């Protein structure tokens, strides 16, 4: 007989979970099982049974080195999460959250009910939206003189200086352009964060794991914003204003989402299992 464990996707209020019968949900992470709600009083965890031998801590770590195995299951996890998060308020859990026993899931829902209920209330009616900030280096360098007061002043002085001095000043200008471009990007990124944070309930600046260069330029910053559904239009308008304001500097904003609110319950989900 195959020993089973419980894979947990998210946590919701039991009343909300009742609106999503399991027959209406997407496929579970493994073909051999179906999704089920594990309910204790006012809280429910969305779960499915998985082979314990495959999902034990040691064996799961080994399976995660298989890119194909991981990609298939990560996609199933995300499909479930996006479906549920669009319909009810949930605390999304990270890929690979496992409980060996059903009693462990029930105990967690019991012991941490106040914390869970508080987090759900904070997330109610809200979505996570991503904002990626790209910069076209060539465009920025060509426009940096108009963006930077320091360079603008130096260019004016060089134009009025004698030829020999003007040449030296031009060399200095070319060197300063790189430094000023870097500083300008940092200022712009900080401003975008400040303005969009004012239009949201919370914000996170995410770590860029690797340098990404696209047709829009190099990725300079990634943000996650917690936005009330009822106020999304205002948030989007603010993002569009920032995009227009910084377009001349070669900066482009990409709005993505809505996503399950992973980045606004990390402290809890990291401790869940």
Give the ranges of each region predicted by the language model.
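An interfacial alpha-helical scaffold signature
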Residues: 1-273
């Amino acid at each position: 007989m195959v020993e089973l464990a419980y894979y947990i996707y998210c946590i919701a209020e039991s009343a909300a979970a009742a609106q999503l019968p399991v027959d209406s949900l997407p496929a579970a992470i493994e073909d051999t099982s179906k999704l089920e709600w594990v309910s204790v009083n006012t809280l429910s965890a969305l779960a499915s049974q998985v082979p314990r031998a495959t999902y034990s801590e040691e064996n799961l770590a080994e399976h995660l080195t298989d890119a194909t195995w991981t990609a298939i299951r990560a996609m199933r996890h995300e499909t479930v999460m996006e479906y549920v998060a669009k319909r009810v308020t949930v605390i999304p859990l990270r890929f690979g959250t496992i409980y060996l026993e059903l009693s462990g899931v029930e105990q967690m829902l019991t012991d941490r009910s106040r914390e869970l209920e508080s987090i759900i209330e904070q997330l109610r009616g809200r979505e996570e939206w991503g904002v990626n900030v790209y910069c076209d280096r060539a465009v920025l360098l060509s426009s940096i003189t108009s963006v930077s007061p320091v360079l603008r002043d130096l260019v004016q002085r060089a134009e009025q200086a004698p030829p020999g001095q003007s040449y030296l000043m031009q060399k200095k200008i070319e060197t300063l352009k790189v430094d000023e471009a870097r500083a300008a990007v940092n200022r712009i990124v900080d401003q975008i964060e400040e303005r969009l944070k004012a239009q949201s309930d919370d914000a996170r600046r995410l770590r860029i794991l690797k340098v990404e260069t696209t047709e829009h330029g190099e990725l300079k910053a990634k943000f996650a914003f917690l936005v009330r559904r009822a106020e999304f239009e205002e948030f989007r308008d603010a993002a569009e204003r920032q995009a227009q304001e910084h377009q001349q500097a070669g900066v482009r904003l990409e709005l993505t989402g809505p996503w399950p609110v992973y980045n606004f319950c990390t402290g809890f989900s990291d401790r869940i299992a």
